[in-house]
Amino acid sequence: MSTDFILTLDRLQAAVAGAAAIRLRQALEPAGGPGSKVFPPTHEGGQYAWETRRVDGQDVRCVLLDSVQSQANRCELALLDALRDGRLRLPLIEARFAEFSDLRSVSTLEAPHRIADAIFRDSTLDGVPFRDSVIGKAFIESTIRDANGLFRWCPTALVFGMWDSTGSVGGLGTKFARALSAEIIGYGAQAGVHTSSRIDPLGIKNIEIYVTPDEDWTTDAGAAKQGKSGPEKTKPSALNHSNIPPTLDLAEENLATVKKGEPLRGGVTLDRAELCAVLSLPGLRKL
């Protein structure tokens, strides 16, 4: 697809009629320029999502910079901003929490499971449990063969995917595969290191510090909480005092994608980064 390609309604209708997909591949680079670090999202234990991909017949070490789920959420929030700014019109369902000023509402563009989320399941519409309401029934009765109800009330669920796993039938609820998938991958990724240190201007060390009965601290042994062997002690470092020598953040055990002793949380440098987005047209045709 050339960089000057403009997707019009006529082109989209023609593509949906017979093509397999609309694909976007966009080269990206770090804000600091080539060679500067980027910091992927961390997962259990502080590891990044490392994987090996086949590129031009070669194994290439890659790292996930933004997942399919995360990209979908970003797209949904962009739609929500445009909707609230009046730049587009779109059906939107919201669960409102008037008594909680810091929350106010959660919409189908924000809830993790979209219209199928437990937030809406456990809400009411005009005093009726949501799933027993006109809108709820239209959503529940939607199927791959007839998704008109879902299209009317929550069309974005047909684009970003939905699984009605929170209803009365649990995991047997209707599934709609996502039609739009996007992710950002870093190719030729090399792990960096994360360092930490602290110089205590007070120079606190080798001081007897005790824990008080209310879990505070004191230097008075007589006011300390008594243990089996006398006053219960603690260390200055436990109170965020004393020096922390320069250290590297390394894995203390083998993790899913990182071996013991390998760097954690240190960012990565890349040969290149790329956004790949695919709109499945067969997926749209099924609807």
Place the predicted regions along the sequence by residue.
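An N-terminal structural lobe/cap that precedes and organizes the functional/catalytic core
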Residues: S2-P112
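RAMP-family (Cas7-like) RNA-binding scaffold and associated basic/acidic loop-rich RNA-contact surfaces
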Residues: D4, R11, I93-L287
